[in-house]
From Swiss-Prot:
Cited InterPro entries: Globin-sensor_dom, Globin/Proto
Organism ancestry: Archaea, Methanobacteriati, Methanobacteriota, Methanomada group, Methanococci
Taxonomic superkingdom: Archaea
Name by which UniProt lists this protein: Uncharacterized protein MJ1356
Pfam families: Protoglobin (PF11563)
Protein family per UniProt: To M.jannaschii MJ1461.
Gene3D superfamilies: Globins
GO molecular function: heme binding; oxygen binding
Length: 189
């Protein structure tokens, strides 16, 4: 397979910079590290309890694998709020793309990550507004920008990698489109 991580990463970052606005100063979030960390722990635990209450996920993950994934996820998401310069940001973007690809292997779908991040964002916005009152809007905007980028990069990495792997094994775009069309027809949509 002639696909490299750097190739996938560069393609995704180029697209993100083309479609997204300029990054905000994410380092301002480090001032609220304790509040953010506590909120992340609470939300990730709640969401993992929800996700792992379904039979499908119970069959994919045993309890130890679930705890390992949960702790890894908490630690990683907290890293979002330790970005202090462009170099940190670039490394963090690479980590998001790597995780987007690795989660393909773990059956941890992008929609799980998206659900967790949206819930974290909602909870953090409320807590920041309680703590900062009228000064909260700038920080909430920065938080919103950062988390949207995480979701965008994660989904793009998952889809880009999956597409390249399927192309490599001979399942091209036309075959994928025809399979989707057949699925839509079978569902009567």
């Amino acid at each position: 397979m002639n696909v490299t991580f750097d190739g996938i990463y560069n393609e995704i970052i180029e697209n993100m910079h083309h479609f997204a606005s300029e990054e905000k100063d994410f380092s301002k979030l480090t001032q609220y590290k304790d509040l953010i960390s506590k909120t992340i722990d609470e939300v990730v635990e709640e969401v993992f309890n929800d996700i792992f209450s379904y039979e499908k996920t119970k069959t994919l993950f045993d309890e130890s694998k679930r705890k390992e994934l949960e702790e890894d996820f908490k630690n990683w998401i907290k890293g979002l709020f330790e970005i202090s310069n462009d170099s940190d940001l670039n490394e963090f973007y690479k980590e998001i793309v790597k995780r987007g690809i690795k989660y393909v292997e773990k059956d941890f779908l992008p929609e799980y990550l998206t659900a967790i991040i949206i819930k974290i964002e909602d909870r953090l916005k409320n807590k920041l507004k309680e703590e900062l009152k009228e000064d909260a809007q700038e920080i909430v905007d920065i938080l919103d920008d950062l988390l949207k980028r995480v979701i965008l990069l994660n989904v793009a990495a998952y889809m880009n990698f999956e597409s390249k792997v399927l192309d490599y094994i001979g399942i091209n775009q036309n075959l994928k489109k025809n399979a989707v069309k057949l699925g839509i027809k079978k569902m009567g949509l």
